[in-house]
């Protein structure tokens, strides 16, 4: 229930941002047009944002025939978590990473890069995918996917206002300062993501994933490897769509600038420390 409230609040905040931008671009008529666009985007994001994100990453669906070991691993973990079998996707990227998407557990999908399959052992891979299924189980994936697509749309609209300017309700060119102000709304979109996708949720998914797999040490080892490789291997698609970075198990962006803006992940060191404490005590709290 809490995530439904959080999703509604996120949609309302983004709708308000669309209206503000519309007003700066086209006055009162721009506000009305932006409201209609926002309502359409909210509807689209709820029903289709998962498909959009998978298409952005050119994710290819696999099954037991095309990726037998990986597919069976997901099926086993989903059974352990008492979840429906999600759709399974692979992304042809060298950087090791993974994410989950979908509006609920009955319409969920998990995706992993080909790079992560090369880098991690089977045991570590189970830890990673259990983490993603924990996001599914706790219904984190709807707000993650909606915030990613809507924040991208906000940034695009803000950039449009910056470069093409706007008109007031009398048809006169808008104040150029307003265009600059609109452009500043792109960072606000990033801030919205940080508010909506709290770092506490990553800790919770680590804990839940450790419970599902029964092996917190495997996830800790996987996070250490992913962190080291992710810092040295670019992820062009994630860099082109930085609002989607918060969906990944590890921030796929290089340090600085945009990476800090969209940094919704807690430090890898702290995540590993918590997992190792779980392994030491046997308590998943």
Curated annotation (Swiss-Prot):
Topology with respect to the bilayer: Multi-pass membrane protein
Co-factor: note: Binds 1 zinc ion per subunit.
Family matches, as Pfam families: Peptidase_M48
GO biological process per UniProt: proteolysis
GO molecular function: metalloendopeptidase activity; zinc ion binding
Compartments, as annotated in UniProt: Cell inner membrane
EC number: 3.4.24.-
GO CC list: plasma membrane
Keyword vocabulary terms for this entry: Cell inner membrane, Cell membrane, Hydrolase, Membrane, Metal-binding, Metalloprotease, Protease, Transmembrane, Transmembrane helix, Zinc
Positions contributing to Zn(2+) binding: 131, 135, 202
Record has Chaperone as a keyword: no
CDD domains tied to this protein: M48B_HtpX_like
Major subcellular location class: membrane
Residues forming the catalytic site: 132
Keyword Nucleotidyltransferase listed: no
InterPro entries linked to this entry: HtpX_protease, Pept_M48_protease_HtpX, Peptidase_M48
Necessary cofactors: Zn(2+)
EC primary class: hydrolase
Transmembrane portions of the chain: 7-27, 29-49, 146-166, 177-197
Record family assignment: Belongs to the peptidase M48B family.
NCBIfam families attached to this UniProt entry: PRK01345.1, PRK03001.1
HAMAP family: Pept_M48_protease_HtpX
Protein's recorded name: Protease HtpX homolog
Origin species: Paraburkholderia phymatum (strain DSM 17167 / CIP 108236 / LMG 21445 / STM815) (Burkholderia phymatum)
Lineage: Bacteria, Pseudomonadati, Pseudomonadota, Betaproteobacteria, Burkholderiales
């Amino acid at each position: 229930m809490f995530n439904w409230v959080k999703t509604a609040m996120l949609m309302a905040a983004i709708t308000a941002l669309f209206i503000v931008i519309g007003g700066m671009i086209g006055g009162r008529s721009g506000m009305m047009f932006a409201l209609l666009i926002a309502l359409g985007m909210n509807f689209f994001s709820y029903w289709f944002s998962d498909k959009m994100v998978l298409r952005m990453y050119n994710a290819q669906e696999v099954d037991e025939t095309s990726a037998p070991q990986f597919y069976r691993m997901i099926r086993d973990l989903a059974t352990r978590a008492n979840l429906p079998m999600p759709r399974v996707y692979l992304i042809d990227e060298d950087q090791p990473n993974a994410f989950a998407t979908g509006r609920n557990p009955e319409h969920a999908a998990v995706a992993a890069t080909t790079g992560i399959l090369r880098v991690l052992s089977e045991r570590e891979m189970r830890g990673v995918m259990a983490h993603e299924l924990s996001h599914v189980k706790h219904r984190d994936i709807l707000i993650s996917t909606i915030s990613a697509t809507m924040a991208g749309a906000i940034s695009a609209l803000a950039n449009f206002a910056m470069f093409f300017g706007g008109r007031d309700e009398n048809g006169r060119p808008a104040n150029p300062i307003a265009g600059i102000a609109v452009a500043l709304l792109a960072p606000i979109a990033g801030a919205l993501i940080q508010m909506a996708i709290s770092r506490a949720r990553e800790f919770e998914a680590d804990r839940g994933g450790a419970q599902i797999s029964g092996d917190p040490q495997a996830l800790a080892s996987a996070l250490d490897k992913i962190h080291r490789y992710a810092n040295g291997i670019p992820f062009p698609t994630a860099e082109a769509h930085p609002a989607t970075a918060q969906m990944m198990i590890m921030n796929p962006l290089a340090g600085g600038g945009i990476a800090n803006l969209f940094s919704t992940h807690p430090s890898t060191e702290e995540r590993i420390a918590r997992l190792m404490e779980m392994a030491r005590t046997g308590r998943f709290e």
